Amino acid sequence: MGRLVKQKGFDILLEAFRLCSDRHPQWSLYILGEGDERETLEAMAETLKLQERVKFLGLVKDPSLVLRDTDMFVMSSRFEGFPLALIEAMACGLPVISTDCPTGPSEIIRNGVDGILVPAEDAHALSAAMECLLADPEKRRRLATEAVNIVDRFGAEKVMMLWDQLRMQVVGIPQRLDVDKESIVLPGHRS
């Protein structure tokens, strides 16, 4: 799920899927999103003889409907900022696997607790993690149960509280922001 661009590493995901696909013919891979790499990725899936098992769904109005019908979420990015797709998947109660790329995933996933981190750009490690997770229903259930707690850690109310704490530390303004109002007014600024 994401923009189909080099940064997101969908080529790595396709290679990882190829590595384990022969042993698991019942598996399918769904890729959501659009981007400059779509044709290249579709050609790669065909070259890898995966075109029947890899589905490019394009932009999906409500990705949670697709996510709820899957067994896991895999993020194969080369680099990230703060990957909302990962948080969305966890909030849907999916066990997640992600590359431990610079910034992002390791700030979100507690490795082995609510998700699995593997080295970035390592299709073999990604494939092994996928096989491990699908072979162990209890581990999938445990990770999924913990994953939904992401809302407690990164929900809007929690994030606003953290921003408020940061603002107080940096600016030294003692008043708290009122997150229950429709708009936020900072002291000294009137709307």
Region annotations inferred by a language model:
Residues R110-G112, I116-A123, C132-P137:
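Conserved acidic donor-binding segment of nucleotide-sugar-dependent glycosyltransferases
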Residues E88, C101-G112, I116-L117:
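Short acidic/histidine- and often glycine-rich active-site loop of Leloir-type glycosyltransferases
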Residues E46, A125, C132, K139-R153, ...:
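A short, well-ordered alpha-helix in the C-terminal region of glycosyltransferases
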Residues P95-T99:
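Short hydrophobic beta-strand element within catalytic cores of glycosyltransferases
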Residues L59, R78:
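Aromatic "clamp/platform" in nucleotide-sugar-dependent glycosyltransferases that forms part
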Residues R3-L19, L29, D36-E42, H124:
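A conserved mid-protein helix/loop that constitutes part of the nucleotide-sugar donor-binding site
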